[in-house]
Amino acid sequence: MMPTVTAVSAILPLAILFVFSRALWKLWYLSDIPGPFWCKLTNIPRLCWVRTGRAHDIHYELHKEYGKLVRIGPSMISISDPAALSTVYPTRMGVPKSDFYKTQRPYVPGTGALPVVFNTQNEELHKELRGPVSSLYAMSNVMKLEPLMDETLQVLFDQIDARFVSGTKAFDLSNWLQFFAFEVMGTISFSKKYGFLEAGRDFNGLLSGIWGFMKSAAPMGQMPWLDDVLYKNALAAKLRGTTGMPVLRIVNKYITERITGHAKASSDHADMLSQFLDIQASNEKVPTWAPKAWTFSNVIAGSDSSANSMTTVMYNLMTHPETMARLYQELSEAKQQAGNVTAHILPWTSIRDLPYLDACVMEAFRIHPAFCLHLERLVPETGMEICGKQIPPGAIVGMSPWVINRHKPTFGEDVHQWRPERWLGHSETRLQELKNTILTFGYGRRVCLGKNIAIMEIKKLISSLVLNYEWTVIDPSEYRVENKWFFKQSGFDVTVKHRSSVRHTPRATNMTKVPPTLAIPASSSTVEVRVINTRTIMRTDHSLLWKSPVEGFKGLDLPIYAFLISNGNRHIIFDLGLRQDYENLPPRIAGLLKNAPYIVTEANVSEILDSDDTGLDIKGRDIEAVIWSHHHYDHTGDPSTFPPSTKLVVGPGVLSLTGGGYPKNPNTTVLETDLSGRKIQEISFDAQADSSVKVGPFDGVDYFGDGSFYLLNAPGHSVGHMCGLARVTTAPDTFIFMAADGCHHPGAIRPSEYMALPRDIPKSLVRKLRTAEADSGGKAQDGDTKPLLPFLPALFPDYTQAMETVEKIKQLDACDNVFVILPHDGSLLGAIDFFPRPINDWKKKGLKESTRWKFCQEMEEALSG
């Protein structure tokens, strides 16, 4: 034991001496730079300041107390004098970024941290990444993207008009400007919208994911070694998840789709991803991961920063109405000079050089920069002289944009006040000097690549919002900012109405009331959906549409659709249609069908799968489960044609109702052979169940557990009746809704309070349908928002619940990102893709718009007899 004690006794004094000498060294190193005492010993104060969300204010106050140079860490010096800008941020190489920027890199297991133009410390790598794409960000190239910006502006206007323009409904404008900024970057980067504006909310956790990334990276940047320990290693990534992944997933998805040819750029305007891929393909020196790095920068840095500046301009214009009035006057004159007094989006050439608009934007950049921590640099071996002090090699120096932009000798004593006029009345040379002083976009060789995109986007947006609308902030005192490297703004509740002087003609949307926002859980997972035409035609008489016969009606030929849903290698079938040997159904049902006007059925669904020779190679043996939307004969098909390994999934209460099937239960509609010899799963929509989830207005169950496909509780038509909702694309999310018999005919849900009848529908047809309803004993409904066909109680044992279900379906039917498919909608035949082709690209092909009112033509023909 003695040797151990002796060793400890010898080591302990050495350890104490090391710690003591280290502390003395820290006190001595940079000892001529003033600052708080504890900052000389540790970076912990810096980390704590950032965690408060108001580090920018603390930095400003420190410079008021200690002067131009403040030591805020053992090796870190904060500088407040703009005269040092060209020294700290030169145009030459040799002053690299500090380890603060390591924390800004997303980490991918197996690959490591992804360097991008903004965060790379290796100056040679930075040159390799920036050089090939710098020309894409020149204003001459950015101007080519203007049509894509205008397209997104129109979507924003449509949503403002539909949701808020009454002037009485308050909303947080900062959220909507963030949605807009992200949609712009999505459109110009990928030719895709994320869907934030249409939905009025975050999708796939993208926005919250970026903010969460910044909230963790900003404090870690003050002590970068902590980031390596807590986040940037394989073990941490496995336990905590991968940093930056919501954005990386989107970027990877779109790059893969573009490379494989599954997605294309806008046919009129080459998006940035296309240009990135062309550059990488034509230059062997550019690494293969470069397009990912470039697009990641666009999404994560180019969106939040622009949204911050947009919000700053609008908030200050509203709280300083005299500046709003002056800007409106300038824009009105520019609109007159443009020669199009009805235009609500002015072209870039008309607003680019407007002095007061430019002053407002520059003042926003100055008073509220998007990034408000230090832009750190490592002092090179030659050292630096700053503000008369010699800074030794290895020290870290940096300037905070918040502090530099409030330099009183440069910008005046009122630096904390919004005053766009400070940018007016200068010579061109002096104005450029002022613009070069603000640090909002960085300085020197690492100045922000996307500056021109941001300026154009912000000026386009601000000019449009001011020209077209009158804005009122509800309570300016509720406005909040939180600094976690990026700024997050909130509490900016406003009301809006059209300017009385503007003849505003919104884009036709056929909507009279905005449907409730669909709160569908976010997910990055999708399924592939194929609509199967089961090759069955059933002719129906009036009883599906009206209470009693209608003169001239000769019947409708109704198809039956099933759905093949694929999640990777897992395949399920939603409904099976009518079995081919329907004469073998229970006698009561077989007799009913025998007396039907007309029925033809050519094959069972399993045979349709097995006979496919297109190379898809999804056969009956591959089906994991058959899902019955309900137990009626035209949906249950023949499960016995699938192997015993295929389970049967039914809604709540179906098992007890069917009682083992016919002949065991003589009163049921299904056969014993449908049920026997296979696993049967009865879905529970109990809110306490692990897989239960709220999906828009429906109670649902997440079938695959990844948010790609939901079974929805849709009662009314029968016991255990279910619908399905499949997510078929992300960023933006689009869905296919499988309505089952929640509604039998599109005329029973269209038009609706959310979707008015188009003017091009023949009035003669509308009169016929309204008259037919009255003649058959129903109550004729008038107006362009009432369904053309009645909702018959005879078809729905629980009419109250059925009405609730159909109202929910109407909400989904009115949403641009949901394609509602009714299984008996004959107007879809020949109008959409059927098995074996998938229908995931319905949105891109415009199938919802092209088929929405086709049933009217079908009804006109049916009533011509």
Curated annotation (Swiss-Prot):
Cofactor: heme
Kinase keyword on record: no
Broad class of enzyme this protein falls into: oxidoreductase
Residues reported in the UniProt entry to bind heme: C448
EC number: 1.-.-.-
MF-aspect GO terms: heme binding; iron ion binding; monooxygenase activity; oxidoreductase activity, acting on paired donors, with incorporation or reduction of molecular oxygen
Pathway connected to this protein: Secondary metabolite biosynthesis; terpenoid biosynthesis
Pfam families, per the entry: Lactamase_B, p450
SMART domains: Lactamase_B
GO biological process, one term: terpenoid biosynthetic process
Positions annotated as glycosylated: N340, N510, N604, N667
InterPro entries: Cyt_P450, Cyt_P450_CS, Cyt_P450_E_grp-IV, Cyt_P450_sf, Cytochrome_P450_monoxygenase, Metallo-B-lactamas, RibonucZ/Hydroxyglut_hydro
UniProt keyword annotations, A-Z: Glycoprotein, Heme, Iron, Metal-binding, Monooxygenase, Oxidoreductase, Signal
Signal peptide coordinates: 1-23
Entry's family note: Belongs to the cytochrome P450 family.
PANTHER family (UniProt xref): CYTOCHROME P450 (PTHR24305), CYTOCHROME P450 MONOOXYGENASE PKFB (PTHR24305:SF175)
Protein role: Cytochrome P450 monooxygenase; part of the gene cluster that mediates the biosynthesis of anditomin, a fungal meroterpenoid. The first step of the pathway is the synthesis of 3,5-dimethylorsellinic acid (DMOA) by the polyketide synthase andM. DMOA is then converted to the phthalide compound 5,7-dihydroxy-4,6-dimethylphthalide (DHDMP) by the cytochrome P450 monooxygenase andK, which is further prenylated by the prenyltransferase andD to yield farnesyl-DHDMP. Further epoxidation by the FAD-dependent monooxygenase andE leads to epoxyfarnesyl-DHDMP.
Protein name: Cytochrome P450 monooxygenase andK
Organism this protein belongs to: Emericella variicolor (Aspergillus stellatus)
Record lineage: Eukaryota, Fungi, Dikarya, Ascomycota, Pezizomycotina
Gene: andK
